[in-house]
């Protein structure tokens, strides 16, 4: 089949949560469109979406302190927290639609109810958390949140963390029962199983080597079939690059103006995993702390109950590492290969600006097991070294670009869509909040790339995602109704309390 041209409507590159979500949306909105998926690895959801390669938090800003910043007057800016929460609600609604429509089954295999908690130490941090709690409590999306700085309450909420604690330093926590643990690997595999039934062509062990524009305005994707060794050429009207850290090099190959002056900085993550089941059973929450002064946002420490392979697990981290690879299964030449004449100055400017991050990563890489245990003991004073192993999580490629606010070579910490002016190709770059906001981000892809179709699609989108285009903050009754109905469908309600 070498050099044979094969035409299709849509090509999705990468079999992760983003392509799975976009493919599922398109199959509901335009069922007649032909879709092909190309994935370098042997199965779906094996890179960033894999359950061991991300924190599995349903990011809705219930406990993540980096989404609420303190202003100079001491008040709390909750804008980003509200935005992230609203975006997660879209994911929750779409997943509930898929379950209710019997397109995917057994929601407990990918989402579980789990309290989300924030925990801080020190007088100043306690005051910050109280102010945060008061600011968020006024918003309907965060109702049901509790605050306590009483040691007896904290012992009830956090028995493992409070046991053996000798310091008299003030502590406080917030707790909300409507949090979730999401197994994005399992969800990705379910979505691709569904897409297979809709005649989506899934090609595993197929590596995309090049993407170029044809004379008639289509995109030609050069694919290496790693099973047969043959080279294939596929053309499509629309291409989505959802290859995690591998998206940037592929975007650069397209040559679109929007791909210029963008760089990527890879950061690897490590987690400690508890192998003593007795310890695992003593904790039931995702508990997020506060990043240390000067540390980057991705360094927020958290102690998480996880549900992986139908078993309860306990993970602590993340610890950062450095590897020049853009994917866990990538090449050591990824970083240097991504430096181009059009982004070299952007990359160099970031290098000068981000000396603090570089120093932080070097320190993290040098940590011994015992040094990591010392950080864990700030959460679990009685933690024993022999009970904990280290696991290497996924690679995250932080976007570097020139911005008006930050100037040349500014490091970005979010998720962003880069698309051609004519909407014929789009790529997803960046890291957190990532998978949790997959539905919002893929709706953004549809809006950018298929603007002429949005009016015709709107009714179906609202059937799948009722709050699409609506602020739930401004419609508390709708939020209440949707939260209850999606919770019932996804099997979350028995542990959740959302107050009127």
UniProtKB/Swiss-Prot annotation:
Under which pathway is this protein filed? Carbohydrate metabolism; tricarboxylic acid cycle; oxaloacetate from (S)-malate (quinone route): step 1/1
Which cysteines in this chain are paired by disulphide bridges?
Answer: none
Q: Which Pfam family is one of this chain's hits?
A: Mqo
- Enzyme Commission code: 1.1.5.4
InterPro entries xrefs? FAD/NAD-bd_sf, MQO
- Give the catalytic activity: (S)-malate + a quinone = a quinol + oxaloacetate
User: Can you name one GO molecular function term for this protein?
Assistant: 2-hydroxyglutarate dehydrogenase activity
- UniProt KW Transcription regulation keyword: no
Which keywords label this protein?
FAD, Flavoprotein, Oxidoreductase, Tricarboxylic acid cycle
User: What processes in GO biological process is this protein linked to?
Assistant: tricarboxylic acid cycle
Record flagged with keyword Flavoprotein? yes
What cofactor does this chain's UniProt record say it requires?
A: FAD
Family label: Belongs to the MQO family.
Stored PANTHER family: L-2-HYDROXYGLUTARATE DEHYDROGENASE, MITOCHONDRIAL
Protein name in the entry? Probable malate:quinone oxidoreductase
Please tell me the species this chain comes from.
Bacillus cereus (strain G9842)
What does UniProt list as this organism's lineage?
Bacteria, Bacillati, Bacillota, Bacilli, Bacillales
């Amino acid at each position: 089949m070498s050099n044979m041209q094969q035409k299709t409507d849509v090509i999705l590159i990468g079999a992760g949560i983003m392509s799975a979500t976009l493919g599922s949306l398109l199959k509901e909105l335009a069922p007649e469109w032909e879709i092909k998926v190309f994935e370098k690895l042997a199965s779906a959801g094996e890179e960033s979406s894999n359950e061991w390669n991300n924190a599995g938090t349903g990011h809705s800003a219930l406990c993540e302190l980096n989404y609420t910043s303190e202003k100079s007057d001491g008040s709390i800016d909750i804008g980003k927290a509200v935005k992230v929460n609203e975006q997660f609600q879209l994911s929750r609604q779409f997943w509930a639609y898929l379950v209710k429509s019997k397109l995917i089954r057994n929601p407990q295999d990918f989402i579980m109810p789990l309290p989300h908690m924030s925990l801080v130490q020190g007088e100043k941090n306690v005051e910050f958390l109280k102010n945060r709690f008061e600011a968020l409590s006024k918003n309907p999306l965060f109702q049901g949140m509790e605050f306590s700085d009483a040691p007896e309450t904290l012992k009830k909420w956090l028995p493992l963390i409070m046991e053996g604690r000798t310091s008299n330093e003030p502590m406080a926590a917030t707790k909300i029962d409507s949090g979730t643990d999401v197994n994005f690997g399992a969800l990705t595999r379910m979505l691709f199983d569904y897409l297979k039934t809709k005649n989506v062509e899934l090609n595993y062990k197929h590596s995309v080597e090049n993407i170029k524009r044809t004379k008639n305005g289509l995109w030609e994707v050069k694919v290496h079939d790693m099973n047969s060794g043959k080279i294939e050429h596929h053309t499509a009207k629309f291409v989505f690059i959802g290859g995690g850290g591998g998206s940037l090099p592929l975007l650069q190959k397209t040559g679109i103006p929007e791909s210029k002056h963008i760089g990527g900085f890879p950061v690897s993550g490590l987690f400690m995993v508890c192998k003593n089941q007795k310890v695992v059973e003593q904790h039931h929450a995702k508990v997020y702390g506060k990043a240390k002064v000067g540390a980057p946002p991705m360094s927020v420490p958290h102690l998480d109950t996880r549900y992986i392979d139908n078993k309860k697990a306990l993970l602590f981290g993340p610890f950062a590492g450095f590897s020049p690879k853009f994917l866990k299964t990538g090449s050591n030449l990824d970083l240097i290969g991504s430096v181009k004449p059009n982004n070299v100055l952007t990359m160099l400017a970031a290098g000068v600006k981000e000396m603090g991050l570089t120093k932080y990563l070097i320190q993290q890489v040098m940590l011994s097991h015992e040094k990591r245990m010392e950080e864990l003991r700030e959460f679990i004073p009685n933690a024993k070294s022999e009970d904990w192993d280290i696991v290497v999580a996924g690679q995250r490629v932080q976007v570097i670009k020139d911005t008006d606010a930050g100037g040349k070579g500014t490091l970005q910490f979010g998720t962003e869509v880069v698309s051609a002016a004519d909407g014929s190709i789009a790529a997803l770059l960046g890291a957190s909040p990532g998978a949790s906001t997959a539905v919002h981000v893929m709706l953004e892809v549809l809006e950018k790339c298929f603007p002429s179709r949005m009016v015709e699609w709107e009714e179906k989108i609202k059937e799948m995602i009722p709050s699409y285009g609506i602020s739930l903050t401004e419609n508390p009754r709708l939020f209440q109704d949707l939260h209850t109905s999606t919770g019932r469908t996804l099997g979350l309600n028995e542990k959740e309390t959302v107050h009127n």
